[in-house]
Design a protein with these regions (language model features):
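Active-site beta3 strand of CheY-like receiver
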Residues: 49-55
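Receiver (REC) domain active-site loop signature in two-component systems and cognate sites
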Residues: 60
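C-terminal output helix
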Residues: 109-118
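Helix N-cap/capping motif at the beta->alpha junctions
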Residues: 13-16, 34-43, 65
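Two-component/phosphorelay signaling modules centered on CheY-like receiver
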Residues: 15-33
Length: 125
């Protein structure tokens, strides 16, 4: 059974991409937190103790998604982190998984793929 009103941290530096993800995730009544870079993501994760899932952009200013993922996974190995990036090369996927991401979505992300992936991890918790 899926978490009701899941708390999802969306880490995305491009506002139009965030607004799209936010619109799609509103279909599952998610409470969305927005971080514009990896540093903000780590800060929000530390302050919001009940994050159910993180959608992590990999290429961002200040602190990239790989580094933010490593820090968050050290603090809570159980929180699912789904990488999202326009760099859909296989080595990016491997780098994301090595950093601790649980899954990977290539941009542009189809709403169906996003919801299926998010629901898979929320159901597994």
């Amino acid at each position: 059974m899926m978490v009701e009103n899941p708390q999802i941290l969306v880490v995305e530096d491009v506002e139009s991409n965030f607004l799209y993800l936010n619109a799609v995730l509103s279909k599952i009544n998610a409470n969305i937190f927005w971080a514009k870079n990896g540093k903000e993501a780590v800060d929000i994760f530390r302050n919001q103790k009940n994050i159910d899932l993180i959608l992590m952009d990999l290429q961002m200013p200040e602190m990239n998604g790989y580094e933010a993922t490593r820090i968050i996974k050290l603090e809570n190995p159980l929180v699912p982190i789904i990488a999202q990036t326009a760099f859909a090369m296989s080595d990016d996927r491997e780098k994301a998984l090595e950093a601790g991401c649980d899954d990977y979505l290539a941009k542009p992300i189809k709403s169906k793929d996003l919801l299926n992936t998010v629901e898979k991890y929320l159901n597994g918790r």
